[in-house]
Amino acid sequence: RFTAEFDFRTYDAEGVILYAESLDNTAWILLALRDGKIEIQFKNEFGTKVTSGGKAINDGLWHIISVEELEHSISVKIAKEAVMSINSPGTLFKQSQGFLETKVYIAGLPRKVGNALVKQINPRLDGCIRAWNLMNQGHSGVKEVIQEKQSKHCLVAVERGSFYPGTGMAKFQINYNNLDSAEDWLINVTMTIRPSTDTGVMFALVSNETVPLALSIVDSNSSDSQKIIVTIGSITVAQLESKKLCTPRKVLVGLLVTKQQLELSVDSHTDRSNTEQLSTLHQAMMANVVTYLGGLPDVPLGATLVTAFYNGCMEVKVNNRQLDLDEAISKHNDIRSHSCPLIMQ
């Protein structure tokens, strides 16, 4: 019979923890998180079922989760206490010559499966799993795979936020148009940052091979401060110096742009500009722009001043909407959407 037990920690509200299927794909079980609560979906020869229950567990604390197939039901426990018992006629997976063989996927789904689920889910999950015991065989099989992949190792202590390791970016399609007027648009970005290195692109708009707007952190001449700059193409249109950006404290950065004016704020300091370069940005906004967080795609040399990937923690709101990296069109695998390394002070 199918059994799985492990310790689990996350701040993420939705995603796939584990998916197992029979070798011929006729039966499967999905263990997932939705609205922070455990959800089970399964299919066998008798039909399909979806059930969720228990309290929300996306609180960043460790929880012991177990799923066990019993004679006529599937039992789900959190911290050894039953939170769900799902009636299940027949066994989940049929034995073959006395053996139970299943394919198990952790923190994701095989490509073809998404549409076959009883209830659709965003599979991306940022969490940590330890103390594996699959099919009562301990962590054999799982441990070897994880040990070889540095990016799959858990951080010891985490807090809420998103972590960019300096190796990639996330891509979004965002509509900046102001509904009142076709010619009007608004870019209102607020972010909380805790950089780990002194140079990198935090937020950028890309139009074809140009970068009509970028918000970056760059090293300054002074040893204990960095600059936060706004560029249109390769021209700096606003900048502010900030002392000791790469420290445990979080810094609040704001960028407000209309076709008439641009305003950059860092903590309580502000730099305003109504440069003629805004007409370049306006032309791009009238066409099509793609939003990037944490870096840039390949653009021609000289298209912009900073091309390095951002390294550190960052949470971003665009036009008052918190961006969820799980909803990005694409995102580098090493970016952690919902957890940041905790700095011990």
Task: Label each residue range with its predicted role.
Residues 1-345:
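Non-catalytic extracellular/lumenal binding modules and the flexible linkers that connect them
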